[in-house]
């Protein structure tokens, strides 16, 4: 909550500063609105979770393959995915399609750990699985902008994203691990849709755009395997809440 409050205060400060500059009478922004092509960079804060689809028999204990009639785990009570933080760094490639429409491509490197909580009938056997990811992302979006009011615009954005997980195979190699120590793994290639709302603030030599975005994967990211943490799962979809600062 404290971090969210700090973000809101920061956003308000930027807004106040921008409108103060409007009073100075400058049509600022470094001429970015007059360019067909506008480069830049972005910093992103993400909060991510899995949308979990479970198998019909997800609650049953996982059997011990070496000892018939015995089980490696207790009966499951719930499987959930809490929000977990991450961050990203990227570049902006913007193309002006019209006075109120842009095409924006933002190649980004994202570092993110997602979590899955397993609660068993015995509360002491609670287990949390961490799924570490490092992804190269290629979002493509159409930006629909309001008319510029001196040094301010609002906009909506919609588009799609291709993500490729580049985390080292060595970090996810659990071939020599016991079944109760195995990892839940993601597919390497992920497709997502995105929607966002943002604001363009024009300073003397650049444009700053804070943006709030929701992103959901289209395909299941689960790589199915036979062990106690993957077997109860049918599908996993990613859901990201993202706050970004774009500089152009």
Q: Positions of the model-derived regions?
A:
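Extracellular loop and loop/strand-boundary signature of outer-membrane beta-barrel proteins
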Residues: 26-28, 74-79, 123-130, 179-185, ...
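Residues that define the transmembrane beta-barrel architecture of outer-membrane proteins
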Residues: 35-39, 83-87, 132-138, 152, ...
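Predominantly the C-terminal beta-signal and adjacent terminal strand-loop region
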Residues: 26-28, 185-195, 199-248
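Short glycine/proline- and aromatic-enriched beta-strand/turn motifs that initiate or cap beta-hairpins
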Residues: 21-85, 248
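Residues on the lipid-exposed face of transmembrane beta-strands in outer-membrane beta-barrel proteins
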Residues: 41-45, 87-95, 107-109, 138-146, ...
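Glycine- and aromatic-enriched membrane insertion/assembly motifs of diderm outer-membrane
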Residues: 56-121
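Outer-membrane beta-barrel translocator domains and adjoining extracellular loop/strand segments
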Residues: 52-58, 115-124, 167-176, 221-227
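Outer-membrane beta-barrel channels and translocator barrels
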Residues: 34, 98-100, 147-151, 202-204, ...
């Amino acid at each position: 909550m404290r971090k969210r409050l700090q973000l809101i205060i920061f956003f308000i400060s930027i807004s106040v500063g921008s409108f103060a500059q409007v009073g100075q009478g400058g049509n600022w922004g470094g001429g970015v609105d007059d360019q067909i092509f506008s480069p830049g960079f972005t910093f992103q804060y993400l909060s991510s979770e899995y949308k979990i689809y479970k198998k019909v028999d997800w609650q049953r204990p996982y059997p011990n393959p070496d000892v018939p009639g015995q089980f490696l785990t207790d009966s499951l009570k719930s499987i959930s995915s809490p929000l977990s933080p991450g961050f990203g760094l990227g570049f902006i490639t913007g193309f002006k399609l019209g006075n109120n429409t842009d095409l924006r491509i933002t190649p980004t490197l994202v570092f993110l750990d997602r979590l899955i909580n397993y609660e068993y009938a015995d509360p002491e056997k609670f287990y949390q699985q961490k799924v570490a990811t490092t992804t190269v992302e290629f979002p493509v979006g159409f930006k629909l902008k309001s008319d510029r009011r001196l040094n301010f615009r609002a906009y909506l954005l919609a588009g799609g994203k291709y993500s490729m997980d580049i985390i080292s195979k060595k970090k996810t190699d659990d071939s020599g691990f016991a079944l109760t120590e195995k990892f839940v793994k993601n597919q390497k290639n992920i497709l997502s849709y995105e929607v966002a709302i943002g604001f363009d603030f024009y300073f003397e030599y650049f444009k700053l755009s804070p943006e709030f975005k929701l992103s959901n994967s289209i395909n299941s990211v689960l790589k199915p395997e036979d062990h106690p943490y993957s077997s109860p799962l049918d599908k996993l979809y990613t859901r990201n809440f993202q706050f970004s600062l774009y500089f152009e």
